[in-house]
Amino acid sequence: MKRFMQIWKPAVVGFLLLTLMCGVVYPGIVTIFASAAFHDKANGSIIEEKRADGTTRKVGSAEIGQTFTKPEYLIGRAASDGAATNLNPTSEEQKQLVEKRIAWWHKLDPTNNRVIPMDLVTASASGVDPDISEAAAAYQVDRISRERGISTKQVKEIIAEHTSDRLLGFWGEPTVNVLQVNLALDRLKM
């Protein structure tokens, strides 16, 4: 029994110590640092809108995509019910999904004869991407302008305001935040 305790005691103590350090202390320190240094992001990048009565309401997160389907709104990437799809690009199921989404876009805006940007007919890897490409936003400008009765120039200006540049000036592509554009479009009514 003594030999058993000599072997297992350090293992159990090590396990408990590592659990405490890796499961409580380290995450706690990182959370405190993130909350202090990156308050907005650490708390979900919540977007709040002021109401006419002076109160505010939370309308969403700048980091999580919302589903917009009305023609007067900028519409984001195809939702995949909050989960990654992981479909093979050559699979029959993926092909059918893309064809279904293309048909939906043609029904939504039958006068638009331009090629539909890829990100409007495919889901993002996360399934909740808040951004679309500049091409996807440009594809929708005429429809939004027509539906809202505003100039295409106004729509383009709002899109430009909510377009982020490439990371470090060269990584990735500029993206447009769908929720922020739609909130700005709604503020035009006020």
From Swiss-Prot:
Highest taxon listed in the record's lineage: Bacteria
Keyword tRNA-binding appears in the UniProt entry: no
Disulfide bonds: none
Localization terms from the record: Cell membrane
TM regions (residue ranges): 13-33
Keywords: ATP-binding, Cell membrane, Ion transport, Membrane, Nucleotide-binding, Potassium, Potassium transport, Transmembrane, Transmembrane helix, Transport
Membrane topology: Single-pass membrane protein
Keyword Transcription regulation: no
Annotated GO CC locations: plasma membrane
Pfam families xref list: KdpC
Gene Ontology terms, MF aspect: ATP binding; P-type potassium transmembrane transporter activity
Cited NCBIfam families: kdpC
Record's function text: Part of the high-affinity ATP-driven potassium transport (or Kdp) system, which catalyzes the hydrolysis of ATP coupled with the electrogenic transport of potassium into the cytoplasm. This subunit acts as a catalytic chaperone that increases the ATP-binding affinity of the ATP-hydrolyzing subunit KdpB by the formation of a transient KdpB/KdpC/ATP ternary complex.
Family to which this protein belongs: Belongs to the KdpC family.
Quaternary structure (record): The system is composed of three essential subunits: KdpA, KdpB and KdpC.
Name of the featured protein: Potassium-transporting ATPase KdpC subunit
Organism of this sequence: Listeria monocytogenes serotype 4a (strain HCC23)
